[in-house]
């Protein structure tokens, strides 16, 4: 009798030399008929395929999100550039819904918030961006501009300085110079001339040999009262472009403001030859010429010319006094303790002594005459405002003489 054994799965007797139970094999499906290692290998391959498909699907989904975010951002960016801040705000918020942590989108959203007057919300976004990236130049610049809106000078200066020393895309030197010049304009608008001058000196030290830039910074230095530093920049610009009207006019104004009227007249006249439409330069040149024609204290003048000028200046001052009194409705001959009637009475009494032959022989009389001229011009200026033409020239001579005295 052939040896048999009992199947451990179904309990039926099977031949001893049979590897499989004939009863079990009849009931098994495809998967149960596979060997264990074959089955596991198939499962592993299936898992890999599922992983690849899932990764592809997720990647495609994120790609679609990025595309939607970029589309919304581009639309919002264009709207903001066109001045449609409210539309831009909505579009950029949509972009952030698909790319929540994008720092560029957050920065542009802050700019849109500022444009719509929602400054505090913008500040929160900007401060969060700054906390994540303290060296971001654009973020620091936007914070500086917020401080400028609120006229918070120390805070604005701090953020401007942070922006200057931050990281910038493109040409960092150009970006930092632009930030510094923006700071300078804010300081000038805030009447912080000394601070503006200090910033401009730093800018001037790092300027490339570019006549336009040198002239631009020179013009700002003049506004800050740095005439000597401005003049150096204008002369550097003229080395490259000797006939460039803006640099010639700038140099002429520097000489004018420092009392060098002969050089001022020369440079301003050259500027006007290049560009006759420089009205401010023309007025300044004419005033410089008037100073040179009226000043009796110029060293190389002879005694007769000094006397002639002093007499002419006295007549001009009296005319200014009478015109100012008429403008203000003041009766110069009335008994009045006001400055204009008092000066008029003094000048009327003094007038018979203002003779050219007397002035040419008596330098002390000439000085006394000019002192009275200066007093009249200053009093008229206080009563009727800054003069023009010959009277402005006399006032400039007066200020120059006061500065020359110990």
Task: Show where each model-derived region lies.
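Eukaryotic alpha-helical solenoid repeat scaffolds
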Residues: 257, 262-406
């Amino acid at each position: 009798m052939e040896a048999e054994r009992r199947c451990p799965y179904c309990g039926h007797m099977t031949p001893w030399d049979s590897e499989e139970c004939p009863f079990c094999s009849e009931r098994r499906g495809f998967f149960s008929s596979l060997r264990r290692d074959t089955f596991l290998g198939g499962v592993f391959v299936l898992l890999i395929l599922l992983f690849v498909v899932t990764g592809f699907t997720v990647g495609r989904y994120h790609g679609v999100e990025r595309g939607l975010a970029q589309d919304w951002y581009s639309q919002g960016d264009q709207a903001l550039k066109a001045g449609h801040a409210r539309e831009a705000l909505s579009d950029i918020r949509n972009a952030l819904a698909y790319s929540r942590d994008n720092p560029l989108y957050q920065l542009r959203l802050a700019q849109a918030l500022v444009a719509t007057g929602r400054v505090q919300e913008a500040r929160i976004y900007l401060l969060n961006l700054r906390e994540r990236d303290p060296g971001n130049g654009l973020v620091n610049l936007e914070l500086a501009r917020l401080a400028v809106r609120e006229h918070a000078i120390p805070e604005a200066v701090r953020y401007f300085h942070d922006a200057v020393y931050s990281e910038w895309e493109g040409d960092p030197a150009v970006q930092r110079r632009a930030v510094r010049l923006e700071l300078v304009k804010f300081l000038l608008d805030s009447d912080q001339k000394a601070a503006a001058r200090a910033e401009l000196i730093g800018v001037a030290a790092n300027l490339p040999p570019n006549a336009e830039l040198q002239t631009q910074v020179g013009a700002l230095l003049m506004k800050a009262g740095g005439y000597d530093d401005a003049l150096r920049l204008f002369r550097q610009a003229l080395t490259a472009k000797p006939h460039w009207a803006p640099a010639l006019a700038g140099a002429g104004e520097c000489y004018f403001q420092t009392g060098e009227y002969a050089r001022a007249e020369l440079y301003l006249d050259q500027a006007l030859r290049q560009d006759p439409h420089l009205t401010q330069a023309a007025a300044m040149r004419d005033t410089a010429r008037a100073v040179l024609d009226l000043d009796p204290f110029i060293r190389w003048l002879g005694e007769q010319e000094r006397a002639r000028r002093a007499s002419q200046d006295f007549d001009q001052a009296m005319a200014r006094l009478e015109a100012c009194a008429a403008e203000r409705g003041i009766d110069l001959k009335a008994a009045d303790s006001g400055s204009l009637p008092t000066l008029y009475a003094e000048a009327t009494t003094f007038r018979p002594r203002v003779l050219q032959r007397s002035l040419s022989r008596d330098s002390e009389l000439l000085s006394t005459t000019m002192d009275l001229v200066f007093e009249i011009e200053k009093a008229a200026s206080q009563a009727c405002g800054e003069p023009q033409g010959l009277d402005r020239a006399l006032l400039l001579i007066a200020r120059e003489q006061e500065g020359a005295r110990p």
